[in-house]
């Protein structure tokens, strides 16, 4: 069974902030000591760290839940609780991280050591020392810690290779990779010998080097999931140059030109941008008897279907078995790579905008709905944040929360919707009566 895994869905939960403390200074010779409760510590973030030693997402096959520690509670003497350590999760180079709910790309991790916070820890709640005022010098008010961010993520590994080998099954991609690199892919005289991508490094006679990926053979309908389908088509996306391998011996009764058209159709159907990558046509198995005649026919059909002003793709006849033409092919590939820039994998519409947490006057602070039992239901990100950080065990904290609701315009909005004195209002699992 293959141990290669290139997709995974996981859940991450950052740590909650520690609760603030209500405490008072009681020391001999210090009359009217005042508040002395400290703030809670910050919750730990969940951080992805790129590790070049990893080659697969196999670590996420059985471990799909990642939870960072919460911050410690505030202490007496105004001391802060200790902040939690970040939970650092290693991922391989080439990992794309998406929000599973929205489908938006959060980050594309390609550099060794690159870090990205996928879930932010909650800030610590404030202790009562923070709420002292001339009017209320000894407040019994504290905040709960802010809940840590929680989300479901879709991970997708797209291997880092400069050059991708594509073609129908059994055209000789694995054989080619084995003779131009030190990679040892599985080679056999049957279809789909390669069932996972293989990666190898090429070094040309002139000393240039580049990474080559041998991808599992494509068949018609691959972009719709036929055969190995799109399972490995994603790995072509990071390549800058495509070597299109064609079996010129036509040993299985196939038409090399029809094969060429069919594979390009699958690449275009999967992702139109793949056709922006320059292609080199590699006609393999030229050591076979019928290959030269088939090559001439292939060139003729190719020329007939290209506009006179279009530049025909470069064609390199080779034999992976006898190594005929390999040096010329590799030099041409290196030269093409030198003048081919990186391709943008995602545009701005694919990426999730970076969120800055702060007050936004245009942000809708709360929403009002009505349940089937006639209870008014309050929701909204800003309102729920205040609710979760309120310590309902302290009367002063409850009154502070009521003032915050009035300040946000909740009372006026409820009246405008028709709420009457004594109506039930629910926030989360907490219910109270509306007082007009």
Swiss-Prot record:
Mg(2+) binds at residues 174, 194. Residues 2-160 form the Obg domain. It comes from Streptococcus pneumoniae serotype 2 (strain D39 / NCTC 7466). Residues 161-338 form the OBG-type G domain. Belongs to the TRAFAC class OBG-HflX-like GTPase superfamily. OBG GTPase family. The lineage of its organism: Bacteria, Bacillati, Bacillota, Bacilli, Lactobacillales. Residues 358-436 form the OCT domain. One of its GO terms (molecular function) is GTPase activity. The keyword Ribosomal protein does not apply. The keyword Glycosyltransferase does not apply. Monomer. Its main location: cytoplasm. CDD domains: Obg. It is found in: Cytoplasm. One of its GO terms (biological process) is ribosome biogenesis. SUPFAM superfamilies: Obg GTP-binding protein C-terminal domain, Obg GTP-binding protein N-terminal domain, P-loop containing nucleoside triphosphate hydrolases. GTP binds at residues 167-174, 192-196, 214-217, 284-287, 319-321. An essential GTPase which binds GTP, GDP and possibly (p)ppGpp with moderate affinity, with high nucleotide exchange rates and a fairly low GTP hydrolysis rate. Plays a role in control of the cell cycle, stress response, ribosome biogenesis and in those bacteria that undergo differentiation, in morphogenesis control. GO terms for cellular component: cytoplasm. This is GTPase Obg. Its EC number is 3.6.5.-. Keywords: Cytoplasm, GTP-binding, Hydrolase, Magnesium, Metal-binding, Nucleotide-binding.
